[in-house]
Amino acid sequence: MTKHGFLLATLVLAGATLPIGPVTAATPEEEQAAFQAYFKQRFPNVPEDEFKNGTYAIDPVTRENWEAIEEFPPYENAISQGETLWNTPFADGQGYADCFPDGPAIMNHYPRWDRERGQVMTLPLALNACRTAHGETPLKYKKGPIADLLAYIAFESRGQITRVEIPQDDPRALAAYEQGKRFYFARRGQLNFACAHCHLATSGTKLRTETLSPAYGHTTHWPVYRSEWGEMGTLHRRFAGCNEQVRAKAFEPQGEEYRNLEYFLTYMNNGLELNGPGARK
């Protein structure tokens, strides 16, 4: 089996009916189509634009509770603090707006392939690159001010459509996508689980009292206020938590492993509307 066929073969094993060609000739575009088709088939009564709501798209009981929480969302303070941070000048008199001239509504520009650096550029990484370029200390990546900044940016970006690109003229971009894909399907930890075990093959089923959320929609609503955390947190904080739940060692937030994973997973979610920040259990 070729590396391009890995995702499609996994979807076949998970029970998907794939309206595309042989698994040995799959492109990222074909893999994306198969990924999205799998979830539409698995949850035929869920409108496509509802997948951005995660578990709440497939579980009416938890959705009712979530809608009640959204009446007075716990992330409102983070949005306000993030706006203040965005508008506060650095010591040199410059600010985030000087690095991001399009304004704060830039969530759908990331993650992206940075040809000059030869790596996946995420929004948190870009925010810290802006800070260090102006002599500021970089922010920590899991929570705190970075989550507040992201909450404000996400709020300003609501309604944008996920649109990650894999440049065809730079094989390094495809390699990063492939590495992210392999991370997603690799077993790890004492429990020997992969991301796909919970969020693809058994999505929608119960694990103890929790409904396992579908991977289609996983990247639309970050950062989130999780009741379990009692505060805002970033996507890479959640990646680390998932690794730890299967008793595997977590990787560094914004390290290559998680950035490539984000690149792959966000590409799989292309076409979905961004609706962050979010609230989760």
Swiss-Prot record:
Q: Where in or outside the cell is it found?
A: Periplasm
Q: How does it assemble?
A: Heterodimer of SoxA and SoxX.
List the induction conditions: By thiosulfate.
Q: Where does substrate bind?
A: R238
Higher taxonomy: Bacteria, Pseudomonadati, Pseudomonadota, Gammaproteobacteria, Chromatiales
Which source organism? Allochromatium vinosum
- What does the similarity note say? Belongs to the SoxA family.
Q: What protein am I looking at?
A: L-cysteine S-thiosulfotransferase subunit SoxA
Q: What happens when the gene is disrupted?
A: No oxidation of thiosulfate with a simultaneous deletion of soxX alone or together with a deletion of soxB.
